[in-house]
Amino acid sequence: MLSGGGGDADLANAAARGQVEAVRQLLEAGVDPNRLNRFGRRPIQVMMMGSARVAELLLLHGADPNCADPATLTRPVHDAAREGFLDTLVALHRAGGRLDVRDAWGRLPVDLAEERGHRDVARYLRATAGD
């Protein structure tokens, strides 16, 4: 396991670094996947978006796929869409992540994917609209 600020801080740090095995160990040890870190963010909000496996582990252990950043109203699906990580976006969506919620600027995840030129992500989001 990681060492540092305790299990909750370690989980956020491991998720942010995409450390699948450390995330697995911490979750199996009972660390709360929804606990806020010292910056007021949850592991699923700070996770390495390119690691769909980290997302899947957090979600399997009860992470909330719809937690919103209090300042920007972005959710993990917004982040995955903006960065173009289709596998992570699909994992979030399958776990109940809402694709129809706007951020503080009125943008949907599909808008962010299109702005960044992530055609495969935008195509998925358009195809699943209305789920």
From Swiss-Prot:
The keyword Repeat applies. Pfam families: Ank_2 (PF12796). One of its GO terms (cellular component) is nucleus. One of its GO terms (biological process) is megakaryocyte differentiation. InterPro entries: Ank_Repeat/CDKN_Inhibitor (IPR050776), Ankyrin_rpt (IPR002110), Ankyrin_rpt-contain_sf (IPR036770). ANK repeats lie at residues 6-35, 39-67, 72-101, 105-131. GO terms for molecular function: cyclin-dependent protein serine/threonine kinase inhibitor activity; protein kinase binding. Disulfide bonds: none annotated. Keywords: ANK repeat, Cell cycle, Repeat, Tumor suppressor. SUPFAM superfamilies: Ankyrin repeat (SSF48403). Belongs to the CDKN2 cyclin-dependent kinase inhibitor family. Heterodimer of CDKN2B with CDK4 or CDK6. Interacts strongly with CDK4 and CDK6. Potent inhibitor. Potential effector of TGF-beta induced cell cycle arrest. This is Cyclin-dependent kinase 4 inhibitor B. It comes from Bos taurus.
